[in-house]
Amino acid sequence: MAILGLGTDIVEIGRIEAVIARSGDRLARRVLSDNEWAIWETHQQPVRFLAKRFAVKEAAAKAFGTGIRNGLAFNQFEVFNDELGKPRLRLWGEAQKLAEKLGVVNMHVTLADERRYACATVILES
Protein backbone atom coordinates (compact mmCIF):
# COMPACT_ATOMS: atom_id res chain seq x y z
CA MET A 1 0.00 0.00 0.00
CA ALA A 2 1.14 3.50 -0.81
CA ILE A 3 -0.01 6.90 0.36
CA LEU A 4 -1.91 8.63 -2.44
CA GLY A 5 -2.84 11.79 -0.59
CA LEU A 6 -2.69 13.66 2.68
CA GLY A 7 -4.88 16.57 3.71
CA THR A 8 -5.23 18.61 6.90
CA ASP A 9 -7.65 21.35 7.85
CA ILE A 10 -8.33 23.48 10.91
CA VAL A 11 -11.59 25.32 11.56
CA GLU A 12 -12.25 28.10 14.02
CA ILE A 13 -15.47 26.98 15.69
CA GLY A 14 -16.53 30.59 16.32
CA ARG A 15 -16.58 31.26 12.56
CA ILE A 16 -19.00 28.37 12.03
CA GLU A 17 -21.13 29.70 14.88
CA ALA A 18 -21.19 33.16 13.24
CA VAL A 19 -22.25 31.72 9.88
CA ILE A 20 -25.08 29.79 11.52
CA ALA A 21 -26.19 32.93 13.38
CA ARG A 22 -26.21 34.86 10.09
CA SER A 23 -27.71 32.33 7.71
CA GLY A 24 -29.39 29.63 9.78
CA ASP A 25 -28.94 26.07 8.59
CA ARG A 26 -27.78 26.91 5.03
CA LEU A 27 -24.17 25.91 5.71
CA ALA A 28 -25.23 22.67 7.38
CA ARG A 29 -27.48 21.82 4.41
CA ARG A 30 -24.57 22.39 2.02
CA VAL A 31 -21.97 20.49 4.04
CA LEU A 32 -23.78 17.55 5.65
CA SER A 33 -24.98 14.31 4.07
CA ASP A 34 -28.52 13.16 4.84
CA ASN A 35 -27.24 10.83 7.58
CA GLU A 36 -25.12 13.60 9.14
CA TRP A 37 -28.05 16.02 8.92
CA ALA A 38 -30.22 13.66 10.97
CA ILE A 39 -27.56 13.63 13.71
CA TRP A 40 -26.95 17.40 13.51
CA GLU A 41 -30.63 18.21 14.05
CA THR A 42 -30.65 16.63 17.51
CA HIS A 43 -26.99 16.96 18.51
CA GLN A 44 -26.25 18.58 21.88
CA GLN A 45 -23.41 20.60 20.32
CA PRO A 46 -24.48 21.19 16.70
CA VAL A 47 -21.94 23.96 16.00
CA ARG A 48 -19.04 21.79 17.13
CA PHE A 49 -20.46 18.81 15.19
CA LEU A 50 -20.66 20.88 11.99
CA ALA A 51 -17.18 22.37 12.47
CA LYS A 52 -15.64 18.92 12.84
CA ARG A 53 -17.43 17.56 9.76
CA PHE A 54 -16.38 20.64 7.77
CA ALA A 55 -12.74 20.10 8.80
CA VAL A 56 -12.78 16.43 7.76
CA LYS A 57 -14.36 17.21 4.39
CA GLU A 58 -11.88 20.00 3.64
CA ALA A 59 -9.01 17.69 4.63
CA ALA A 60 -10.41 14.94 2.38
CA ALA A 61 -10.73 17.32 -0.57
CA LYS A 62 -7.10 18.34 -0.04
CA ALA A 63 -6.01 14.70 0.18
CA PHE A 64 -7.71 14.05 -3.16
CA GLY A 65 -5.86 17.07 -4.55
CA THR A 66 -8.98 18.65 -5.97
CA GLY A 67 -10.64 20.85 -3.41
CA ILE A 68 -14.43 21.18 -3.54
CA ARG A 69 -15.03 21.79 -7.25
CA ASN A 70 -15.38 20.00 -10.59
CA GLY A 71 -18.46 18.08 -9.48
CA LEU A 72 -17.30 17.38 -5.93
CA ALA A 73 -19.51 18.60 -3.10
CA PHE A 74 -19.14 18.55 0.67
CA ASN A 75 -22.14 16.26 1.10
CA GLN A 76 -20.45 13.56 -1.03
CA PHE A 77 -18.03 13.02 1.89
CA GLU A 78 -19.78 11.48 4.90
CA VAL A 79 -18.17 11.21 8.32
CA PHE A 80 -19.40 8.42 10.57
CA ASN A 81 -18.05 6.55 13.58
CA ASP A 82 -17.26 2.86 13.63
CA GLU A 83 -18.26 0.55 16.49
CA LEU A 84 -15.32 1.80 18.59
CA GLY A 85 -16.11 5.47 17.95
CA LYS A 86 -13.29 6.01 15.46
CA PRO A 87 -14.14 8.54 12.73
CA ARG A 88 -14.41 7.03 9.26
CA LEU A 89 -15.19 8.42 5.82
CA ARG A 90 -17.80 7.21 3.33
CA LEU A 91 -17.95 8.60 -0.21
CA TRP A 92 -20.86 9.19 -2.56
CA GLY A 93 -21.28 10.35 -6.17
CA GLU A 94 -18.32 12.06 -7.83
CA ALA A 95 -16.16 11.64 -4.73
CA GLN A 96 -16.64 7.85 -4.91
CA LYS A 97 -15.88 7.86 -8.65
CA LEU A 98 -12.69 9.85 -8.06
CA ALA A 99 -11.57 7.46 -5.32
CA GLU A 100 -12.10 4.51 -7.65
CA LYS A 101 -10.22 6.27 -10.47
CA LEU A 102 -7.26 7.00 -8.17
CA GLY A 103 -7.25 3.48 -6.73
CA VAL A 104 -8.06 4.47 -3.15
CA VAL A 105 -8.61 1.36 -1.04
CA ASN A 106 -8.33 2.82 2.45
CA MET A 107 -8.98 6.20 4.05
CA HIS A 108 -7.69 7.18 7.47
CA VAL A 109 -9.31 10.01 9.42
CA THR A 110 -8.17 11.68 12.59
CA LEU A 111 -10.18 14.41 14.22
CA ALA A 112 -9.58 16.66 17.22
CA ASP A 113 -11.27 19.64 18.76
CA GLU A 114 -10.61 22.04 21.56
CA ARG A 115 -12.55 25.00 22.88
CA ARG A 116 -11.91 27.22 19.83
CA TYR A 117 -10.75 24.90 17.03
CA ALA A 118 -11.51 21.67 15.24
CA CYS A 119 -8.88 20.00 13.09
CA ALA A 120 -8.76 16.92 10.90
CA THR A 121 -6.28 14.94 8.84
CA VAL A 122 -7.17 12.49 6.08
CA ILE A 123 -4.76 9.99 4.50
CA LEU A 124 -5.64 8.12 1.31
CA GLU A 125 -3.99 4.76 0.58
CA SER A 126 -3.83 2.67 -2.58
Curated annotation (Swiss-Prot):
Enzyme class: transferase
Disulfide bonds: none
Record-linked SUPFAM superfamilies: 4'-phosphopantetheinyl transferase (SSF56214)
Signal peptide positions on this chain: none
Keyword set includes Lipid biosynthesis: yes
Needed co-factor(s): Mg(2+)
Family statement drawn from the similarity comment of this UniProt entry: Belongs to the P-Pant transferase superfamily. AcpS family.
Name used for this protein in its record: Holo-[acyl-carrier-protein] synthase
